[in-house]
Amino acid sequence: MSQRPNPSALIWLLLSVLVVGLDQWSKAWVLSSLPEYTPVPVIDGFWNWYRTYNTGAAFSFLSDAGGWQLWFFTALAVGISGLLAFWLSRTARGQWRSALPYALVIGGAIGNVIDRLMHGHVVDFIQWYIGSHTWPSFNIADSAIVGGAIGIAVFGLFDKSGKQEPGTGNLR
């Protein structure tokens, strides 16, 4: 009797869909409700809503590169999302330490791709600051990407079960 195959972690793509939905809903709210480049205090001395735009990547990297970066970052995000989705298909459903961060990165990357294709830039609106020190504005998609990247690094560093093949959930 053959063993039943272990279901893949592709079900975790539902989390990616949730991230994309929350990200796009929040950006639609921002575009319809917040003034451009005007702080709206949420927690005085720490957190503002601040509608701004980013044509580059994290911390506005390459934002003044002349336009080619839109297609570069779109292709990069789609490529990485495709690779992570492939790895999800090769990961056992119960391997949440791999599946959760992959799904977060996919959702965040696709959320920002939608912005780039619809608007030519990414809509950012969360601004944290202390005194005159301001963290660059970001959005829900950015948060998911960072959370996923941290998860990949932390779970990869502290995995005590042995070495895993990337995206498989299988031990080497």
UniProtKB/Swiss-Prot annotation:
Q: Which UniProt keywords apply?
A: Aspartyl protease, Cell inner membrane, Cell membrane, Hydrolase, Membrane, Protease, Transmembrane, Transmembrane helix
Its EC number is 3.4.23.36
Q: Which GO terms describe its cellular component?
A: plasma membrane
For the keyword Membrane, the answer is: yes
Catalysed reaction(s) here are: Release of signal peptides from bacterial membrane prolipoproteins. Hydrolyzes -Xaa-Yaa-Zaa-|-(S,diacylglyceryl)Cys-, in which Xaa is hydrophobic (preferably Leu), and Yaa (Ala or Ser) and Zaa (Gly or Ala) have small, neutral side chains
Biological process annotations from GO: proteolysis
User: Which residues are annotated as active site?
Assistant: 124, 142
Cite the NCBIfam families for this sequence: lspA (TIGR00077)
Show the HAMAP family listed in the entry: LspA
Into which family does the record put it?
Answer: Belongs to the peptidase A8 family.
UniProt-recorded name of the protein: Lipoprotein signal peptidase
